[in-house]
A protein has these predicted regions:
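C-terminal peripheral helix-coil segments that are non-catalytic and often amphipathic
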Residues: 1, 94-97, 136-152, 156, ...
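Generic hydrophobic, amphipathic alpha-helix propensity
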Residues: 12-21, 37, 62-66, 70, ...
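Hydrophobic alpha-helical connector segments
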Residues: 61, 75-105, 163-167
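N-terminal intrinsically disordered/low-complexity leader segments
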Residues: 1-11, 22
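Amphipathic alpha-helical packing segments from all-alpha helical-bundle domains
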Residues: 71, 75-76, 108-110, 118-152, ...
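Anionic, Ser/Thr-rich low-complexity intrinsically disordered regions
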Residues: 47-48, 81-83, 104-120, 132-135, ...
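Short hydrophobic clusters on alpha-helical segments that form packing/core surfaces
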Residues: 16-24, 95, 197
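Helix-turn-helix
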Residues: 15, 23-57, 61
Length: 203
């Protein structure tokens, strides 16, 4: 984003980014071309390219927006917890709550993770994001929460990377379950996940 952007230009970027999230969630990453995103935004493709330069830069903006909205939900919840178990529970409940309030964002970031290949083979995790987002990510990182629990004796000796992967997989499965069955009970699922993982981590 150019530092000299006007308020109107910033608003247009935000609109295009929102339309890109919707298009990727609805059509899939491969089918969400710049032209289709432009059509959804009601602008010419040249307008999208004026604001973002190329699709890779647009995708980077989408990723940053998805992370920003996710961390807005998760950071306060995790920070409010006083124990590792509380932080783990808050992480799970907040992320599943995000699926409820921002379903398109979660589907879009998953689509990008599975399908995006930028210039030089760049993947989702290689895309540049605002340094503040990296700071927020560290505050809710599962490996950190689990490692802290092990260090303090609150959790049993465990491999934080393995348990973190299992938690992420379980949260991701909730997204697919909700797509298949819009009535899927995310709150009940959150209760079950919290119970299962706190039992799995208990000393």
């Amino acid at each position: 984003m150019r530092s000299s952007e006007t308020f109107t230009e910033q608003a247009r970027r935000a609109q295009i980014t929102a339309c890109a999230i919707e298009a990727i969630a609805e059509l899939g990453y491969a089918q969400a071309s710049v032209r289709k995103i432009a059509d959804r935004a009601g602008v010419a493709m040249s307008v999208v390219l004026y604001h973002f330069g190329d699709k890779d830069s647009l995708i980077a903006a989408v990723v940053s927006e998805c992370y920003r909205t996710l961390f807005e939900v998760m950071v306060p919840a995790v920070d409010a917890a006083q124990t590792a178990a509380g932080r783990l529970e808050a992480h799970i409940r907040a992320h599943l709550g995000y699926l409820e309030t921002h379903p398109a964002h979660q589907v879009a970031i998953t689509e990008i993770g599975n399908g995006f290949r930028g210039k030089g083979g760049v993947r989702l995790w290689d895309l540049p994001v605002d340094p503040d987002l990296d700071t927020d990510r560290a505050r809710v990182e599962l490996e950190v929460i689990l490692g802290d629990g092990v260090d303090t004796g609150e959790f049993r000796p465990l491999n934080p990377t393995s348990i973190a992967s299992a938690v992420r997989g379980a949260i991701g499965n909730a997204m697919f379950s909700r797509i298949v069955d819009p009535a899927f009970d995310l709150n009940g699922y959150a209760d079950d996940l919290v119970d299962a993982f706190l039992r799995a981590c208990a000393p």
